Amino acid sequence: MPAEPTLRRAPRELSDALVSARARFASASGVSGAAVAVGAGVREQARRRFVMVVIAVYLLAIFEGSIRKYVAPQFGQYIFFVRDPIVVYAFLLCTRHALWPRATPMFVASVAIAVLGLFWFLLQSALGGFSDTRLLLGVYGWRSYFLYAPLAFAIGAQFDRTDLLRVARITLWLTLPVAVLVAAQFFSPIDSVINVGIAAEKELQFSGLGLDAERVRATGPFTSGVGLQQFVATAFAFVLAYAIRPAPKRGLGLAAVAVFAAATLSCIALSGSRGTLLQCVLIGAGAIAFGLLARGAALKLKAVVVPLVLAAMAVALYPVLFPEGYAAFTNRWAAAATVEAGFQGGVIGRALFGFIDFLRLFDAVPMLGYGLGYGGNASILLHASVDGIEPGKLAETDFARHMVDLGPVFGLGYIVFRLGFAAWLGRAVWAATRRTAEPLPMMLFAYAGYVVVIGQLTGHGSINVYGWLFAGFCLAACRGTPLAPAPSPRSAMPRALQAPRARMPWA
């Protein structure tokens, strides 16, 4: 019988090997094995705490908008940053308990550009003049560019199959109340509390984009339709991953998958968002791509058939189940197509415009840029200006924003980092798909890869946190078979010294 191929050790496996090596060294040097086991147990407890912290960040990314909108709108500008101290705590856990991944070139690059970004901001302040506006925009800009990228690598190193299964189930169960909320928002008046929030002051209310004269685009638990788009797209990725997985290894009944799929599709139907639809189509294309790469005729066929069947059912039932939503969406699509008639390639051409839009600013911005954060929406709201120019109005796409914020040299470097990270992640997904025939890595990459390459990664808070979190989940999915429930691996520690595994109500 031929020997099984030896797979490259993942970061967690390297850590386990390191623990075993330390145990052998301790035995040879007379150190108690129990002491080594206790140390390993402490590290595992820290890993589990890190997982819970990341899940808390994920839940805040979903519900932070609801808190700002329905609970405490007067503190909305502070609640917006509530995730950041938790992320810093996650970094402290990684540093204190050696949870960071190996020093791969891409991980080192993410940390190096974060440090460079800090010095860049100080240099911009020294040469451009320090002010309260520059400080506020600089802190916000640094956060948008650099804070969450290292977290993706830590998630990829420390999340195991049980942790990913928990994230998937949280997301899918949340599709049910979110679908109800989206329907309520769609059928409610534009100025109703469910759409604008509980604030009496006009400036504290959240006015979404209009869908037609009578309806506003649903935002779900977020403050904008962009946030809902991220939630729906990632939920659709999990739905397809579960639907494609063979039944014995799915870990979730087919009826439950069908219910979650229906809830997700209803969110698409009533969102009024073309971006949501197109992103889900892209994820469906990712499922077909998985079918081309996967091994096994049955799995290949299922990966192609499932998204096509879902699409056919959605097209057939959309005007029947949601006639008002269908009419509003088709009118919205027609109106947008008229506006985009000037773009070569229509909506696709507009989406790809971001790849070349930044070139017009290459010679038009200062060498150091106008300043971190000056190309974002916050700069527009504050009417920030430099030498009589409002930089926030110069950039519509994310790559153009890099030119405004960082200048042509560092801005181009950050673009290269984004593209390089996406290519590196895609290579990991390719290898995982060929090795394990698991659909989840490809499904998550269909979302995260798009966001990292061309999404408003530094221009919108929800896209920023979702993009890097799901890049991390994708990395973790590449390490194993996350949708297949499996018994806990045997531990080298005595049973009495093993830390109990925390269980959550949804696990």
Give residue spans per PLM region:
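A membrane-periplasm/extracellular boundary helix in multi-pass inner-membrane enzymes
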Residues: 2, 10, 180, 186-190, ...
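Interfacial loop-to-transmembrane-helix boundary motif in multi-pass membrane proteins
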Residues: 47-54, 59, 106-116, 154-197
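N-terminal hydrophobic segments of proteins, predominantly signal-anchor/transmembrane helices
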Residues: 49-69, 84-147, 451
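Loop-to-helix entry and N-terminal half of a specific, functionally important transmembrane alpha helix
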Residues: 52-61, 256-264, 423-456
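Long extracytoplasmic/lumenal interhelical loops at the membrane interface
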Residues: 66, 71-73, 327-406, 425-430
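Transmembrane alpha-helices of multi-pass inner-membrane enzymes
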Residues: 90-91, 283-284, 441-498, 505
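Alpha-helical transmembrane segments of multi-pass inner-membrane proteins
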Residues: 168-192, 196, 208-215, 219-272, ...
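Interfacial juxtamembrane loops and adjacent helix segments
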Residues: 190-217, 374-399
